[in-house]
Structures are given as structure tokens and as C-alpha cells.
């Protein structure tokens, strides 16, 4: 009985070392979650009070479902309108 337990423990250890720890679902890896800079949104739209709504409307005109004002690629970047096919985190 102890030999079986040792064998199972060895098998689990081997699987963790070779395969790594299970990571669950990866977020933001889908091409549908990729955020693309809007081509039609006028500059300064995101600075307005209803900037996210204007951005979403511009993205809808570009055949996207979601649009949001973001600081990309860095937090220090200028606020711009980005579009994506799906709403992703």
C-alpha cells in the first residue's frame, strides 16, 4: 500500500515539474479581446464628459461591438478611443 502511495506521489510530482502548475483560463489572449485604436473617433472625444459613449458609438461605426477610452500602451499615454470585438478585462 505504501508503495502505491509513493508511486502516485512520484507521478504527481513528475506531472507538475513537466507540465507546470495549472494556470486556469488565460485572460485577454483571444483575438476578439484585442484593443485596436479607433480610426474614426475625433481627437479629444475621450476628454468629454460622455467620452466613453462617444467612443463606443465610433467603434460601432467601425463594425466593433465595444469601445472604451484607455491610456494605452502605457498609463502615461494620452487618453484615446480603443475598440474591440468583445468586452474583455
Swiss-Prot record:
Its predominant location is secreted
One Gene Ontology cellular component term attached to this UniProt record is:
extracellular region
Q: Does the keyword Magnesium apply?
A: no
Q: Which domain of life is it from?
A: Eukaryota
Enumerate the subcellular locations listed in this protein's record, separating them with semicolons: Secreted
Keywords in alphabetical order: Antimicrobial, Disulfide bond, Fungicide, Plant defense, Secreted, Signal
Entry similarity comment? Belongs to the DEFL family.
Record-given protein name: Putative defensin-like protein 40
Source organism of the structure: Arabidopsis thaliana
Q: What is the lineage of its organism?
A: Eukaryota, Viridiplantae, Streptophyta, Embryophyta, Tracheophyta
